[in-house]
């Protein structure tokens, strides 16, 4: 237990120490302030603007900014869909994989364009090297850049005083890729290669098995194909950009994507690094670092609580595994200095602590990569990752999207506090009026509406229910998790159901699109409304939004919205399964 505590403390300490300076750096980058890297890459930036025909100084209103987001995403979606369907005709396909079906290609394109990275396929057997590099890896960069760009449009709206314009989308996205995502990914890729992650273009290699197996038909299996390919260059942006789509089907549980405890710690740090840093970026850009620290503190408290709960649930394991009433495995606990606990679906090189910490981190942010199989967690251990997504992916959340989602909850909290004391709500010197509240409510309720509607439709589809590998509460949990992952733009999965069908690929694609672009539209409209307001000096009755009381209120509102929205569904799934297990 002591080792687990030290491992978690080391991770959280490193995260905080790295996030602070990175947050200040990101703020300088996105506002075009001079800095050391700009001297080297400024010619490249200017060349990109000339190529696109863009004036980076041109200001956009929210409608123009949103139109650019939609146009860029639409072109990306069409291009990626075409690439996946035609990959069998293109080079860099040493395994001669066939083109993806229209519904799988569409689902995958939507998934990567929306920063969800839901995967209804196993990458090593379905995608060519060209598709992995020119298609999926490129989207790992640009989809994350879209989130950062939208966040900065909101920041400019908050700090403006009667001004117009939210910045330039093309300049914001270019700077996010060129100065933030590319340099960090390059450094991380080199570190991963040093740890043993492959980066090559060779064909898969056949390795002789130490213990040959027999197939179902009795044929001997003496060799195994070992996937090769450009894996390190995809793993780094998948983690840093909160994307999560792995080169291999089992993601970072695969020893090639995540071979050592050191690579595991590095990839976990990359999960949360930019979302955590953006909290400090926000504080620096509005001129009050206390605001960013308060938001970081609220996120940090929720994350550490989730990690503690998940670790405890997995250490306690299942009380019994029985067949015909006879206990086959005695209860175990990981607290007695042994491996113990629920090790099903986990890599022994990571253990319970590394697996539970990753599961909490990957669902707190909208990453979705895994180093263990969430479907094999205990009912309560698997419920926590689900709840973290259902809260709206605002506990650090996606790159950019997590913080702008959290700011919507901040406005909701300020509004509720204003109602209690009978004052017009204010945030950072700006009065929060009905229009801003309507947009904040759209952001806060999009995730619950999309998830519950999608999950309900899936439960009504006989082909989905019939495809479940597990019955009763756990089967329902698998359906709810799939809808949650798509609607919250996370991408992780419980598995257990056949996702690669036309119905599910299309339905989950619709959920991903709604979960991504409805909040973006509301955030940009809110930013435009805030930009037109004058900043008023704080008065004696102004609610402080950077003290412990406000942090508590913010956490309470986040949990209240999540609990009211999803408790009935959770009661039918993981909670019912836990009661069945312990009765």
Swiss-Prot record:
Keywords: Cell inner membrane, Cell membrane, Ion transport, Membrane, Potassium, Potassium transport, Transmembrane, Transmembrane helix, Transport. The system is composed of three essential subunits: KdpA, KdpB and KdpC. Part of the high-affinity ATP-driven potassium transport (or Kdp) system, which catalyzes the hydrolysis of ATP coupled with the electrogenic transport of potassium into the cytoplasm. This subunit binds the periplasmic potassium ions and delivers the ions to the membrane domain of KdpB through an intramembrane tunnel. This is Potassium-transporting ATPase potassium-binding subunit. One of its GO terms (cellular component) is plasma membrane. PANTHER family: POTASSIUM-TRANSPORTING ATPASE A CHAIN (PTHR30607), POTASSIUM-TRANSPORTING ATPASE POTASSIUM-BINDING SUBUNIT (PTHR30607:SF2). The gene is kdpA. Its main location: membrane. HAMAP family: KdpA. It is found in: Cell inner membrane. The chain crosses the membrane at residues 3-23, 66-86, 135-155, 177-197, 266-286, 293-313, 402-422, 440-460, 506-526, 549-569. It is a multi-pass membrane protein. GO terms for molecular function: P-type potassium transmembrane transporter activity; potassium ion binding. Belongs to the KdpA family. NCBIfam families: kdpA. Pfam families: KdpA.
């Amino acid at each position: 237990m002591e080792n687990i505590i030290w491992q978690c403390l080391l991770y959280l300490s490193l995260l905080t120490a790295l996030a602070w300076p990175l947050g200040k750096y990101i703020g300088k980058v996105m506002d075009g302030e001079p800095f050391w890297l700009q001297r080297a890459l400024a010619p490249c930036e200017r060349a990109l603007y000339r190529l696109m025909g863009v004036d980076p100084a041109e200001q956009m209103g929210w409608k123009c900014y949103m139109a650019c987001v939609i146009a860029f995403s639409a072109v990306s979606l069409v291009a990626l869909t075409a690439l996946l369907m035609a990959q069998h005709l293109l080079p860099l396909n040493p395994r001669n994989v066939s083109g993806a079906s229209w519904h799988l290609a569409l689902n995958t394109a939507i998934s990567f364009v929306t920063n969800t990275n839901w995967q209804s396929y196993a990458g090593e057997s379905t995608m060519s090297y060209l598709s992995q590099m020119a298609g999926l890896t490129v989207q790992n960069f640009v989809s994350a850049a879209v989130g950062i760009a939208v966040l900065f449009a909101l920041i400019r709206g908050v700090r403006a005083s009667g001004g117009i314009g939210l910045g330039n989308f093309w300049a914001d996205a270019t700077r996010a890729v060129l100065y933030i995502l590319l340099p960090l990914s390059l450094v991380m890729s080199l570190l991963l290669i040093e740890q043993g992650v492959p980066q090559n273009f060779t064909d898969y290699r056949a390795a002789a098995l130490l213990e040959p197996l027999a197939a179902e038909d009795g044929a001997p299996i003496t060799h195994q194909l070992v996937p090769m390919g450009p894996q390190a260059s995809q793993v780094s942006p998948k983690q840093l950009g909160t994307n999560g789509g792995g080169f291999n089907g089992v993601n970072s549980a695969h020893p090639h994507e995540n071979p050592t405890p050191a690579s595991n710690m590095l990839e976990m740090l990359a999960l949360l690094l930019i979302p955590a840093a953006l909290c400090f970026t926000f504080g620096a850009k509005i001129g009050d670092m206390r605001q960013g620290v308060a938001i970081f503190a609220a996120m940090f408290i929720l994350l550490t609580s989730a990690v503690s709960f998940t670790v405890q649930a997995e250490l306690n394991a299942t009380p019994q595994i029985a067949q015909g009433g006879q206990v086959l495995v005695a209860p175990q606990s990981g607290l007695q200095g042994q491996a113990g606990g629920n090790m099903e679906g986990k890599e022994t090189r990571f253990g319970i602590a590394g697996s539970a910490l990753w599961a909490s981190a990957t669902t707190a942010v909208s990453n979705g990569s895994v180093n263990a199989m969430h479907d094999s967690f205990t009912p309560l251990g698997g419920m926590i990752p689900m709840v973290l997504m259902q809260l709206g992916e605002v506990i650090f959340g996606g790159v950019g999207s997590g913080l702008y989602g959290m700011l919507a909850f901040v406005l909701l909290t300020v509004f509720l506090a204003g109602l209690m004391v009978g004052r017009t709500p204010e945030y950072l010197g700006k009065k929060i009026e009905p229009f801003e509240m309507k947009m904040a409510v759209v952001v806060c309720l999009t995730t619950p509406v999309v998830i519950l509607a999608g999950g309900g439709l899936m439960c009504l589809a006989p082909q989905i229910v019939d495809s479940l590998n597990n019955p009763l509460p756990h089967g329902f949990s698998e359906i709810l998790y799939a809808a949650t992952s798509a609607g919250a733009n996370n991408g992780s999965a419980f598995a257990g159901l056949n996702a690669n069908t036309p119905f599910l690929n299309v339905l989950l694609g619709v959920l991903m699109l709604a979960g991504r672009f409805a909040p973006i539209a509301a955030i940009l409209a809110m930013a435009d409304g805030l930009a037109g307001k004058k900043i008023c000096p704080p008065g004696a009755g102004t609610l402080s939004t950077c003290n412990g009381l406000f942090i508590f209120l913010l956490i309470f509102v986040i949990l209240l919205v999540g609990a009211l929205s999803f408790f009935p569904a959770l009661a039918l799934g993981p909670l019912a399964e836990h009661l069945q297990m312990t009765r």
